[in-house]
């Protein structure tokens, strides 16, 4: 078995590490650098440049130089975040046939984000092969903890395109914890990993413990924002420079791709310089020209001004920390150490915000650019058997479930559940004689299915026709160690089964992910009322169904006056079910239960046989199995 390399596939930079002599080691690329820019360029003569070579020529070839494509993986072109990026990058973002966000070269060639990422992975693979002197085919690749199923699949696809068998997808904060904690002594402790990279933000609360001589890393909770990172900080600086230049010269540089690329490089440099100095000067001669001649950009930027420009971005990263702590059932005082990961954490304002929130200074002995790759290499070593006595227990970031009767989202696996995991639940049909059901798989935190992210739909056909509520359909969710979901539905009577590896059409947008949790908090009361209304409707539907069956069975044996009262109560309840008044539905249900009980008693007395009315009783409730029933849902056009 060859080496399993560890790769941090970053938005801005990527890093490669291996296990050597039982310890992680970062491998320098062909240029001698320990990190590689995640940039790919296509030249006029057909050459593909990757890393520093691509970055060097970006100013002269902006429309064919692709960076930060990790922010596009698993996203639809129509996503608000993608639309926001359209005018902020010099290259073209386009819509693929399935609605996904792709990129296009100046001559119109369309490329998937996975293809661009694969070029970066190919360079990392070759770097490893040159260093090791042997072929490398296996890797552990990191992703943001808040990446969803689609984005994880896309990352695996990028690895496959690059010729790598991706043995494991591992969350970036978890990898950083592995790198930090593997050799640390001192007993059990809880740490927070604050990971603010080039394009994404994650925070994970992790417990490191010694269990029977084995070092165990257990993720207690994770949260994040898949569209917050250093690129957003750079954009604030770019916007400021563009606005200042526009005020001074009356020229909007946003319409000039060449100027935009120069501004991006200058903004990034200025941001980095201001981490160690109080003031810098952005000087870009010949940035553009008009009828009066060439124009030069020369603007002073202070650290205080930069901090004011990005203040809301820094504050935006603190709320996920609060949620993660709450989900873990901890207070800030319970966290012994805070680890900073990602290049953007070098900014003093970010470090101060983290220190203020957690009430302790974050550790400075972890390299924010290399820790994630080292952790990936350690996980590769565990899989290959080179690293012993390490157990990693990660979690799924969002709840997973299906849509059930009444538009309810029924959770099968809760968020922050340790993976790999498997869970199943038994459901039933909503209609008499129903021979097929549609399983609608969703991801999110809202009670109402329509507010969650649709991941996939598939049909289970061939169900033996039977009265509603009788078929037993077992739906199973299986999340593997990569966080990738497999769903199956099985008719327990016929043993007919349908399995699917969920491959979503796109990833979750930033606003969708954040709002899933935020809206769940804000709409908790609304969701509770909706849930109660659906339960009342479902109970009423079951009561109507069982009462009609009782009329059919016993109607000829009892008086017409009683049947008339039952029919009248049925009509009133059927009308109430069409409305949204839970109290009225419950009141009409109670009335029907009472007259249906009279029907049952009359039929029993008539027959003098005790149990022939079973199933028609007023208290005939919807079977427990049917509390969350299937309804056939038509494919929407998300």
From Swiss-Prot:
InterPro entries: ATPase_NBD (IPR043129), Chaperone_DnaK (IPR012725), Heat_shock_70_CS (IPR018181), HSP70_C_sf (IPR029048), HSP70_peptide-bd_sf (IPR029047), Hsp_70_fam (IPR013126). It comes from the Bacteria. Residues 598-621 are annotated as: Disordered. The modification Phosphothreonine is found at residue 200. The keyword Glycosyltransferase does not apply. Gene3D superfamilies: 1.20.1270.10, 3.30.420.40, Actin, Chain A, domain 4, Substrate Binding Domain Of DNAk, Chain A, domain 1. Induction: By stress conditions e.g. heat shock. SUPFAM superfamilies: Actin-like ATPase domain, Heat shock protein 70kD (HSP70), peptide-binding domain. Keywords: ATP-binding, Chaperone, Nucleotide-binding, Phosphoprotein, Stress response. One of its GO terms (molecular function) is ATP-dependent protein folding chaperone. Acts as a chaperone. Belongs to the heat shock protein 70 family. This is Chaperone protein DnaK. The lineage of its organism: Bacteria, Pseudomonadati, Pseudomonadota, Gammaproteobacteria, Lysobacterales. The gene is dnaK.
